[in-house]
């Protein structure tokens, strides 16, 4: 079934066309600093991880993980292999991060490891990758109550190192399973004109064995391949589908398909089939070559030329028959058997100079052999339509666009992104949204029982979208708008992480070093403000605040909750109190 082309429906009441911008506020933000017992387990890119995709996936990795099921609880993994947790009850009485789990093996001995990754699957389940290719499914008990010992329920080596980007917990017919989405970047030996790497998304389902209440095993393993790291990828809460936002499409690789095949997207078929015949043409005639079985004779061949048709039989077996693209001189057309066991047919065109796009109408069994000299002549005839320069004279006649209105920060260098939904059973694409120039900004978990939301730039605004897998006709809901944030963030060249509060009260971004920018939603004014230009009272204002951290270490992690911002560096964890009203 062909995928449905969909669009994202913007809710007009959530837009503010009269938004005037953010006002810089100098109100101080309470900031607290914790020194870590051991440094964060940062894994730097190796010399062989040189592509942009490696940088997106691993170089910009967020080492701080927020437990969406329990507000203000964050985790990180240190270089001793410990998962450390900080749960905030009171800002002024912060305790030290505590160890909740320790990796069973010393991963620092692995030269080719990636950063360890963790995802909070449910209130009592966690999935973990140690960065060496081993997957753990861990039962944590109720993390919101008194701390319980984390217990490994499943662990298995899955090949090359990967990171976990999403997971869900499923309970169907009293059978518990955990679905996990893994990401790898692997070498593509046959890719001669690309980066030499491809991105692999693996959808793994781990299910409890019926005969053993504590034994889990892999029951499903799907692989998708693409040429770009997805901006967003998540499994639907019911496990029936997968949504991906990426600027290059992903394709499902079936289990029996050769995994070493070329990933060239322009290739229409995955398996190269030898053409039944080859043909070439000049302005006056066509030559068709058909491979014959050994020891074929003229008596085995029957050919009928008609002005608009051709019929070829070999030992009474139909080889080629159908309507020709254009008329031929059937009396002047000939055929002969060559020494290399091939049949050569010469067809004389009635309409000289007409170039045929196909030999027999609708027939796909042949291959056109193009003459290099002919291709050069065609290119020369089309030369006046092309240029080596991009719009070499934009001011001539009518310019293509008003270059003065286009700012440098508005230029997108990536290709047009798309949002795709894959069915979990058939693995076919069911819905496609062409995002065009709607730049992906960030994702956030608003409700942990739902899929993560994603934020896209629409004109100057940033719009937050909540996927709903249960609504087939309207799968993506516009739930919030951050006014002018799409435009504002584009000018922040050094931004590293982007986030927003789950209640949409503010959005925040941090740079690679030290600075954090906070953009609040418009709030009512406590005093009267008058706009003299428009002659009206201003009822509310949107504030911008800037926090500067007292550190020279690069920022490795960034998470936002309704009340706080958490910022992780190599040696410190900073807590910024953003909202004080309860």
From Swiss-Prot:
Q: Which Gene3D superfamilies match?
A: 2.60.40.790
Q: What is one GO cellular-component annotation here? A: cytosol
Q: Which PROSITE patterns match?
A: CS
Subcellular location as annotated: Cytoplasm; Nucleus
Q: Which residues carry this modification: Phosphoserine?
A: 7, 387
Q: Mostly located where?
A: cytoplasm
Query: What's one Pfam family the UniProt record gives for this protein?
Result: CS
Kinase as UniProt keyword: no
Do the record's keywords include Phosphoprotein? Answer: yes
Q: Which InterPro entries match?
A: CS_dom (IPR007052), HSP20-like_chaperone (IPR008978), NUDCD1 (IPR037895)
Identify the keywords attached in UniProt to this record, alphabetized: Cytoplasm, Nucleus, Phosphoprotein
User: The organism sits in which domain of life?
Assistant: Eukaryota
Q: Which ranges carry the CS domain?
A: 272-360
Name assigned to this protein: NudC domain-containing protein 1
Q: Which organism is it from?
A: Mus musculus
UniProt lists the gene as Nudcd1
